[in-house]
Amino acid sequence: PTLILSGENDPITPPAYGDLLLNGLSNSIHLVGPHQGHGIMHRGCFTKIFSDFLSTTNVSELASTCIKHLPRVPFFINSLGPAP
């Protein structure tokens, strides 16, 4: 099983890369965080999704509707990243 996480606005590894990876894997899921950038695993509910995946390794039962409610990442951030 494979869990692929992408941020909709990630300039480094855009969602299209995740889509390409998804096409070559069976038993996988690609979740895209709306209005998110790079490194989304620790933002909002992605931490729980990742934890649930590691616990169950079942991509078909992951509760992922929470990603629709993530706050937008600020356009300008300092060198430490956006505020939590």
Feature map (PLM): residue ranges:
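C-terminal subdomain of alpha/beta-hydrolase-fold enzymes, centered on the catalytic histidine
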Residues: P1-P84
